[in-house]
Amino acid sequence: MKKTVVIGAGFGGLALAIRLQAAGIPTVLLEQRDKPGGRAYVWHDQGFTFDAGPTVITDPTALEALFTLAGRRMEDYVRLLPVKPFYRLCWESGKTLDYANDSAELEAQITQFNPRDVEGYRRFLAYSQAVFQEGYLRLGSVPFLSFRDMLRAGPQLLKLQAWQSVYQSVSRFIEDEHLRQAFSFHSLLVGGNPFTTSSIYTLIHALEREWGVWFPEGGTGALVNGMVKLFTDLGGEIELNARVEELVVADNRVSQVRLADGRIFDTDAVASNADVVNTYKKLLGHHPVGQKRAAALERKSMSNSLFVLYFGLNQPHSQLAHHTICFGPRYRELIDEIFTGSALADDFSLYLHSPCVTDPSLAPPGCASFYVLAPVPHLGNAPLDWAQEGPKLRDRIFDYLEERYMPGLRSQLVTQRIFTPADFHDTLDAHLGSAFSIEPLLTQSAWFRPHNRDSDIANLYLVGAGTHPGAGIPGVVASAKATASLMIEDLQ
């Protein structure tokens, strides 16, 4: 019996496979690595657990919906723990902001920066909530297959001033530069430059205020495992170490999926959660549609890459918050260099993940696991030798953290590893080593983004960061909902 094939067991691929299997469509999930999760890979070392990728869950309802439509309860598969504060934001001046969901507490902290910005923040939150209603709840999981779909959304996008950038939008309401940074950095979580990404992405703030920030007990990998178990409980099949080499096309339909090990899967439909550029360039590079799409996609602007440093310490550093944003001395200038620069900047801003604050089980007793990441240019802009640059940047980051945030860090090191743009390219098959696929510019969003269903190869579908609506766990899970709606309609 032919089965529907989903390529890639990242969050998008898993969510799509669950929706298809729950709808009665026999589905096989092909994952090239030895574990599911895609970017949400997990490493274990000397009793430490390291989530490799996404760590911020802001829409638990989208995940719960996957279990509910399958007639199951999410809490029987994975438990989500609340994160408080959502983030601690730190500046080199010594100023800090604990961003939490308590309005009175948050406004009291805003007053310390600029009393006039309390009212401005209230107006910004109302604006963000309006964008959230339109951009996420109404349009986030609707496939934009024709330009008419874009035109229908146009009036509301104009009303919300979607042509403005995230930073411009925040600045309409808020005066203090620290607070402008605090409420504009969110687009970086999905690969967007706050100074060029559409103000639609201010919806992330409302999303967090609506449902909170959560972390899976046992780490993000525990959520991946729960989703895999749900899929297999429904009768789905998952194949690991299954690298797809080619999509065989006959009469403008994918008829077979060929693996690198020689196996062949006959199929009625294929959805790719693989890198969108390489889906067309590598898997369909022999076909005119693949060549045409790949050439067009290679002209698009890609999001930044990341340098990630994982480390385990024999001290818990309980003074830290779960999520800490460490702003460097520059904001606009540094971000410009991250997105357009041809070299590493002399400074950096960091995201520090301290999951043992919420779940101490991720490290041996008295210890803690961490990761810290620095946004950096992708390989297309900065083709650096990361075998040389990686250890040097690691040492700079360790020095910075030890001086400002984690006294004694180097003497407490038990284990460490780095993951560079070269690893994004080589291990994750990410075009140019981009961490978030196509940059979320307004001219690369919705209909302008690769469509959830290909317009020429009738049974080829896309899911994940490279299609609508975009990157981040809420984005790729929403893309799975959009793509599933098309596939279920086409296949049933």
UniProtKB/Swiss-Prot annotation:
Gene3D superfamilies the record matches: FAD/NAD(P)-binding domain
So what EC number does this one have? 1.3.99.31
Family indicated by similarity: Belongs to the carotenoid/retinoid oxidoreductase family.
**What is this protein identified as?**
Phytoene desaturase (lycopene-forming)
Pathway terms, separated by semicolons: Carotenoid biosynthesis; lycopene biosynthesis
Keyword terms: Carotenoid biosynthesis, FAD, Flavoprotein, Oxidoreductase
Task: List required co-factors.
Answer: FAD
Principal EC category: oxidoreductase
Residues where FAD binds: 5-38
Q: Name one GO biological process term.
A: carotenoid biosynthetic process
Q: State the Gene Ontology terms under molecular function.
A: oxidoreductase activity, acting on the CH-CH group of donors
Q: Which reaction does it catalyse?
A: 15-cis-phytoene + 4 A = all-trans-lycopene + 4 AH2
The organism encoding this protein is: Pseudescherichia vulneris
InterPro entries per the UniProt record, alphabetical? Amino_oxidase (IPR002937), Carotenoid/retinoid_OxRdtase (IPR014105), FAD/NAD-bd_sf (IPR036188), Phytoene_DH_bac_CS (IPR008150)
